[in-house]
Amino acid sequence: MRLAALVATAVALAGCGKAELARGPYELIVREPRGEAAATEPQVTAYEWAVARDRLARLRQAQPERPYVERVRLAIGDPRTGKRYEARGAVAINPGRAARMMLVGPGGTTALDVWVTKDRFRFSVPAINLQKRGGTDPADARGLPIGMLRWWFLSPLAGRLLLARSTSAESAWILREGPATVTLRSDGDRFVALRREGNVLEGIEWFARGLVPQAGAHGQYLEGRFGLRVDVVVEEVLPTEPDPEAFADPDEPGTAL
């Protein structure tokens, strides 16, 4: 099932008070397992739980702990304008703490500058003097690809494990991180994830061998409210760590994390 279809399905289910969870082991739509919903969840055997929990632990253990930089190619499609923007640049990531993405436009000018931490963000398009700042309220970032960085690049596997299922080929997990619920399924080479916080939904489909920085990894992020789509290709992972200043608030020099 394609990512857009998964998001559409999740949105539809979110509006149906008594909709049951899908019975297929890898179609766990975002819904907190409590109350009436808990009674409709498929039963998970102890073996399935153990296998899925072990696979999640191995994915988490492989996550980088040190800051790193990826050279990326992005294409951003905005259905509100019908336009598609393409650019290259770099993303500096301090896992679990902060990320800074800068895309370069014609003539080497900065086309886009995005800084995010777990509780703040700054989105800037210098060419048109556009700047937006926000915090953790999902409404602050609607229509912007903030979630792609804050969630998928900073801490894609964060959260308390609520439910897990497995077969020999695939596993699926439901994670709870604060007010957000994340549904993730993978066969180890392809990851499909949905994140829901209140009425805000976002999803990503990611192709890579595990969730470690690697050239050739690619995916598609979809913002659920306006349908903003971001296609990402990792072209290179640099061998050196980024300057700590990369993670400083751009408007407050000297505040590197």
Regions from the PLM with identified roles:
Residues 17-86, 94, 237, 244-257:
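N-terminal leader/targeting segments and the immediate start of mature chains
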Residues 33-35, 73-79, 106-109, 119, ...:
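Hydrophobic lipid-interacting interfaces of membrane-associated proteins
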Residues 13-15:
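C-terminal motif of bacterial Sec signal peptides marking the signal peptidase cleavage site
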Residues 94-151:
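An acidic-aromatic
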Residues 164-257:
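Gly/Pro-enriched, hydrophobic low-complexity segments
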Residues 1-6:
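Bacterial N-terminal signal peptides that target proteins for export
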Residues 68-73, 82-90, 96, 115, ...:
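Beta-strand-dominated lipid-handling architectures at cellular/organellar boundaries
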Residues 132-166, 173-176, 184:
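Extracytoplasmic segments of membrane-associated envelope/inner-membrane machinery
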